[in-house]
């Protein structure tokens, strides 16, 4: 079995359906004795350029280990799902389980207060 990294972008109007989509795609991989090494839901983000007149989309990253049949079935599911705007599959040399740079950035943002937030309590105390 080979290792793959898959990123797919979902139409923002279908964001509520993303957990169900993830479950369906996970079941496709696991039904053929594949494994999911990393699954990250990056949420709604700005696109670099509009796709179908949409400027934001919901991003999901999956690192999987599966055979060619499971990958073909997964890509077939992406192609025939109108909510999936784009998908990209990259063959990897080994399984990747560490958090992606996008998740590390998100975590560091949540741990450090924003620059604009530091000045607000002082202004409120003066008033």
Curated annotation (Swiss-Prot):
Disulfide bonds: none annotated. One of its GO terms (biological process) is translation. Residues 96-127 are annotated as: Disordered. Belongs to the bacterial ribosomal protein bS6 family. This is Small ribosomal subunit protein bS6. Gene3D superfamilies: 3.30.70.60. InterPro entries: Ribosomal_bS6, Ribosomal_bS6_sf, Ribosomal_S6_plastid/chlpt, Transl_elong_EF1B/ribsomal_bS6. Keywords: Ribonucleoprotein, Ribosomal protein, RNA-binding, rRNA-binding. GO terms for molecular function: small ribosomal subunit rRNA binding; structural constituent of ribosome. Pfam families: Ribosomal_S6 (PF01250). Binds together with bS18 to 16S ribosomal RNA. One of its GO terms (cellular component) is cytosolic small ribosomal subunit. HAMAP family: Ribosomal_bS6. Residues 117-127 have a biased composition (Basic and acidic residues).
